[in-house]
């Protein structure tokens, strides 16, 4: 894996920096693990925009990734190949189990074709193996962590993501996330050893607006250049400031305002990610 800076043959390529991984499969993905994916463009069933700045972009199939990895315990497997996935920042790995079934999983850092893998409580503590947290030594770096047993991984799934197992107390373990938050999870929740691969993803430079449109992301217009009917910051004669603290188009404070309302899981957070 390497960062490649392109030659300035055009304004768009002048600042472009790409992540090149020669180990990725160059052919078509595994067809039985593909599903159709329809463009929603950020609209709901009424056609109203519920998520702004979405629309357009290149068509692509959804790769069915196994986030649970709980029904192949004890069955040896090996990595057939690594693949690019347009639906996420991390790369994925096509895994062949000894019973002949193939599945996609999130590729961990250092994973290569031919690498043996194992799921279950008897799996060795090696990068890429998936097992319950009760069987993982304290201090181990983990990724793809479940929040509820059997629900599938929800924490540390993006490129370069990881968490650290800090402690185990009774039925719960403490996990420190990249944000600094320390969270309690049940010891029967599963996790994968190691970090998520493609850690250089955050260092890429897209280079031009069109490449962002290819990804299905539409432009973000500043509220201060809108009309008063469209945004609280809008209006004024000539180039003017917002005239108030930054807010969203609906008047909610935009910077530093906490919006978390899930009180049901507050007891699972040992240390908040906020410093104060």
Swiss-Prot record:
InterPro entries: NA-bd_OB-fold (IPR012340), Rib_uL2_dom2 (IPR014722), Ribosomal_uL2 (IPR002171), Ribosomal_uL2_bac/org-type (IPR005880), Ribosomal_uL2_C (IPR022669), Ribosomal_uL2_CS (IPR022671), Ribosomal_uL2_dom3 (IPR014726), Ribosomal_uL2_RNA-bd_dom (IPR022666)
UniProt region (Disordered), positions on chain: 38-59, 225-276
Biased composition (Basic residues): 50-59
GO cellular component: large ribosomal subunit
GO molecular function: rRNA binding; structural constituent of ribosome; transferase activity
GO BP of this protein: cytoplasmic translation
UniProt KW Magnesium keyword: no
Record's keyword terms, sorted: Ribonucleoprotein, Ribosomal protein, RNA-binding, rRNA-binding
Entry keyword annotation includes RNA-binding: yes
Polar residues: bias regions: 39-49
HAMAP family cross-referenced by the UniProt entry: Ribosomal_uL2_B
Function description: One of the primary rRNA binding proteins. Required for association of the 30S and 50S subunits to form the 70S ribosome, for tRNA binding and peptide bond formation. It has been suggested to have peptidyltransferase activity; this is somewhat controversial. Makes several contacts with the 16S rRNA in the 70S ribosome.
Stated family: Belongs to the universal ribosomal protein uL2 family.
Assembly notes: Part of the 50S ribosomal subunit. Forms a bridge to the 30S subunit in the 70S ribosome.
Protein name, as recorded: Large ribosomal subunit protein uL2
Organism: Cupriavidus necator (strain ATCC 17699 / DSM 428 / KCTC 22496 / NCIMB 10442 / H16 / Stanier 337) (Ralstonia eutropha)
């Amino acid at each position: 894996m390497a960062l490649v800076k392109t030659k300035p043959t055009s304004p768009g390529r002048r600042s472009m920096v790409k992540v090149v991984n020669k180990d990725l499969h160059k052919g078509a993905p595994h067809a039985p693990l593909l599903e159709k994916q329809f463009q929603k463009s950020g609209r709901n069933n009424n056609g109203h925009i519920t998520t702004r700045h979405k629309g357009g972009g290149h068509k692509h199939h959804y790769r069915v990734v196994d986030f649970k990895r709980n029904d192949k315990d004890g069955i040896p497997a090996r990595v057939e190949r690594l693949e690019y996935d347009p639906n996420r920042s991390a790369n994925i790995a096509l895994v062949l189990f000894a019973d002949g079934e193939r599945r996609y999983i999130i590729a961990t850092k250092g994973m290569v074709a031919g690498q043996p893998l194992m799921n279950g409580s008897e799996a060795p503590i090696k990068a890429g193996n998936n097992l319950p947290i009760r069987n993982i030594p304290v201090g181990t770096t983990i990724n793809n962590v479940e929040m509820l047993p059997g629900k599938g991984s929800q924490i540390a799934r993006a490129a370069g993501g990881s968490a650290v197992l800090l402690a185990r107390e009774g039925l719960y373990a403490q996990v420190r996330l990249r944000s600094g938050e320390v969270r309690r999870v049940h010891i029967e929740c599963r996790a994968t050893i190691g970090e998520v691969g493609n850690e250089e993803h955050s260092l890429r430079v897209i280079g031009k607006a069109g490449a962002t449109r290819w990804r299905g992301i539409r432009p973000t217009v500043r509220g201060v250049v809108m009309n008063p009917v469209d945004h609280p910051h809008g209006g004024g004669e000539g180039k003017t400031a917002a005239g108030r603290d930054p807010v969203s188009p609906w008047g909610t404070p935009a910077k530093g305002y906490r919006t978390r309302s899930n009180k049901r899981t507050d007891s699972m957070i040992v240390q908040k990610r906020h410093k104060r």
